[in-house]
């Protein structure tokens, strides 16, 4: 926002390295890092990624992935640290610690339950009970929010109990903020708010309704074109 002297926040995925530019180090995928069970090594890898990311002029990393992979058919298992919530919590926490030590914004994702889509179909209904969600899939997020100064968090594409996470006050307000005390900002996964107007969810007739639903749930930053649509802004 130039007239307010508010600079842009530049970001990168950085799931296993600063992948948006040539010359950066590409480290093993998260699943391989999880298999080491080595928090010290993981922290050092994250520190190296943090240095290279900041050197490139980027201040925010959309990682680590704290999804607990529960279905081998899911095509994004390699982005996760594994199938055990304790392992994901510990390795994910070490990763965040490494980022923060270098001054890099960290954005753990995808909150919540993204690692258990029905039939292994990415981004679809996760079909989890409240107990499964709380005792398995929310554990890593609760751990890092309570133990590290995470500045932001990315929500998931999925539905939970029939409600898209992009408009879920239960997940994004009641649990995340009121129960856990998270005081950072929530980023939408790319296109997730726009999906509220599509056949995938169809809880909104247009972008204005979609934006209102997402804002009411507590999503501050939109990866996509909904929040910056002219009609929405007006």
Where in this protein do the model-derived segments appear?
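Glycoside hydrolase catalytic-domain context in secreted enzymes
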Residues: 1-234
